[in-house]
A protein has these predicted regions:
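Amphipathic alpha-helical polymerization modules
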Residues: 1-119
Length: 119
């Protein structure tokens, strides 16, 4: 019995965790490059990527299609489009979503473990 034959115990949450993890990396890159002249901030539209993945698109392609450049409210003179406060806020919100998704998955694992042990 291969992995593809096993029932999906986590539903869309496994995919959501992957997407949130990738988004965390993109946002961290934006924050790290806040002082880099000409750097263009990007973000992953989490909702669009999740919908695409739910519709059968593989996660990597869903991320590629949902990755967009940010349009700054206040463009800088050096061409950098990172707005640090917005990036930090998006990072924090994404981290909360990541933690909540991970907690749900942990709960599922605990439930399955208890069921297998007969608790």
């Amino acid at each position: 019995m291969g992995r593809e034959d096993m029932p999906d115990l986590f539903g869309i949450n496994g995919t959501a965790l992957q997407l949130r993890s990738q988004r965390m990396g993109v946002l961290a890159s934006n924050i790290a490059n806040a002082g880099t002249p000409g750097y263009k901030a990007k973000d992953i539209d989490f909702t669009a990527a999740l919908r695409a993945a739910e519709g059968g698109t593989d996660v990597s392609s869903a991320i590629d299609k949902a990755t967009l450049y940010r349009v700054p409210v206040m463009p800088s003179l050096d061409g950098n489009t990172v707005e640090l406060q917005n990036e930090q806020l998006a990072f924090s919100e994404n981290a909360v979503g990541y933690a909540a998704t991970l907690e749900f998955i942990r709960g599922r694992v605990d439930t399955v473990t208890r069921a297998l042990k007969g608790d």
